[in-house]
């Protein structure tokens, strides 16, 4: 088992990474002072596969377990679903000595984390991510949120988990589309932060697509190491942490306007990375060769590189609701070659023009 500690003072926590770790969840929670009433929040598809293992482990450690199921899909990561979760937390009798376990992908983790951050002004929660995207990105760092009709993740809080337990064996049950979408976040780390890691992804793309267990565990660990390093220096995204949004500014806007469910999150991020690379090229931060390498690797992993048809006026308007927008200026992440990045201040119109998406 790989153990990685995210050092955030009193908010520090461990990330445990291994295959077949789900049955040990209850013990690891107990070791961290978590016991009593616990709500496991999941969706029907994930619960069918893993809820019984998780429930049995938690019961064995002396917990009273309530399973709360939420609908699958980004379109349900909203206030209506959150209120249904609150209703069930109250009905189950959870109090400030209780905790929440988020069992699932990014939607479950984001919503369950925000429920934990706000229920009774905050109760502990544990992340048990079962998708590649959640394992390498959304489960680590304490970003919790729900969506608003005007944009993605506009209502949320920074709220760190007590523990992240990653069982890489859960990746074997992922639909191929979800697995490939998670690879967009993996590629993001290489482009924005680590050239050697990017080269490993190019070199081992075949093994990755074959879902080689050792290869996947190394990839998940490296992504978590890179994210933890940034979060430790900038927990609440006041500066450095913005680099983790590479590909996300345009990606989020495209995902919102295409309609949740049209593109899964990782597919939108892949398109956002291609557009970010074009903007970086136009700004002189990278070469044509760098852009070609990024497009090639995304294509090798079966990810889209061309945005759907979207009204550019609405796209510009949506960009201005982005959390990184200040007085009409967007803090945009450009890649500097491959393996490094830089923050550039641009207007929405400049972003669309430089990316080739004319207003």
Swiss-Prot record:
Q: Where in the cell is it found?
A: Cytoplasm
What catalytic reaction does the record list? Answer: 7-phospho-2-dehydro-3-deoxy-D-arabino-heptonate = 3-dehydroquinate + phosphate
Q: Which GO terms describe its molecular function?
A: 3-dehydroquinate synthase activity; metal ion binding; nucleotide binding
Kindly list the GO CC terms recorded for this protein.
Answer: cytoplasm
Q: Which family does it belong to?
A: Belongs to the sugar phosphate cyclases superfamily. Dehydroquinate synthase family.
Record-listed NAD(+) binding positions: 72-77, 106-110, 130-131, 143, 152, 170-173
Is this entry keyworded Metal-binding? yes
Keywords of the record, alphabetical order, are: Amino-acid biosynthesis, Aromatic amino acid biosynthesis, Cobalt, Cytoplasm, Lyase, Metal-binding, NAD, Nucleotide-binding, Zinc
Q: Can you say what this protein is called?
A: 3-dehydroquinate synthase
Looking up InterPro entries in the UniProt record yields: Dehydroquinate_synthase, DHQ_synth_AroB, DHQ_synth_fam, DHQS/DOIS_N, DHQS_C
Entries under PANTHER family matching the protein: 3-DEHYDROQUINATE SYNTHASE (PTHR43622), 3-DEHYDROQUINATE SYNTHASE, CHLOROPLASTIC (PTHR43622:SF7)
Q: What is its EC number?
A: 4.2.3.4
Question: What biological processes does GO assign it?
Answer: amino acid biosynthetic process; aromatic amino acid family biosynthetic process; chorismate biosynthetic process
State the free-text cofactor note. Answer: Binds 1 divalent metal cation per subunit. Can use either Co(2+) or Zn(2+).
Predominant subcellular localization, coarse grouping: cytoplasm
CDD domains linked to this entry: DHQS
Briefly state the protein's biological role: Catalyzes the conversion of 3-deoxy-D-arabino-heptulosonate 7-phosphate (DAHP) to dehydroquinate (DHQ).
Cofactor names from the entry are: Co(2+); Zn(2+); NAD(+)
Instruction: Quote the record's binding site residues for Zn(2+).
Output: 185, 248, 265
């Amino acid at each position: 088992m790989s153990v990685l500690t995210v050092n955030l003072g009193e908010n520090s926590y461990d990330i445990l990474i291994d295959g077949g770790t789900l049955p040990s969840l209850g013990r690891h929670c107990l070791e961290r002072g978590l016991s009593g009433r616990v709500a496991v929040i999941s969706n029907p598809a994930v619960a069918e596969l893993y809820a019984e293992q998780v429930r049995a482990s938690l019961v064995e450690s002396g917990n009273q377990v309530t399973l709360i199921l939420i609908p699958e899909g980004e379109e349900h990561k909203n206030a209506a679903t959150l209120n249904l979760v609150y209703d069930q937390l109250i009905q189950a009798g959870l109090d400030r000595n209780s905790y929440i376990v988020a069992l699932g992908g990014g939607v479950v983790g984001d919503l369950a984390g925000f429920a934990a951050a706000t229920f009774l002004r905050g109760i502990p929660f544990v992340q048990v991510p079962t998708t590649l995207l959640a394992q390498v990105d959304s489960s680590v760092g304490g970003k919790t949120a729900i969506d608003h009709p005007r944009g993605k993740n506009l209502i949320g809080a920074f709220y760190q988990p007590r523990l992240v337990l990653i069982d890489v064996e859960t990746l074997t049950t992922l639909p191929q589309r979800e697995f490939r979408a998670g690879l967009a976040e993996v590629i993001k780390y290489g482009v924005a932060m680590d050239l050697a890691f990017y080269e490993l992804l190019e070199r081992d793309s075949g093994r990755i697509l074959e879902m080689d267990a050792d290869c996947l565990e190394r990839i998940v660990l490296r992504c978590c190491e890179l994210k933890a390093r940034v979060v430790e220096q900038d927990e609440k995204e006041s500066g450095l942490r913005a680099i983790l949004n590479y590909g996300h500014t345009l990606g989020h806007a495209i995902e919102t306007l295409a309609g949740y469910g049209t593109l899964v999150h990782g597919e939108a991020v892949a398109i956002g990375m291609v557009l970010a690379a074009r903007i970086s090229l136009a700004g002189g931060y990278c070469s044509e060769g760098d852009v070609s390498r990024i497009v090639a690797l995304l294509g090798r992993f079966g990810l889209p590189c061309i945005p759907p048809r979207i009204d550019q006026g609405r796209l510009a308007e949506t960009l201005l609701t982005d959390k990184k927008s200040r007085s009409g200026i967007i803090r945009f992440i450009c890649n500097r070659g491959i393996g490094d990045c830089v923050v550039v201040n641009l207007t929405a119109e400049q972003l669309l023009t430089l990316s080739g998406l004319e207003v």
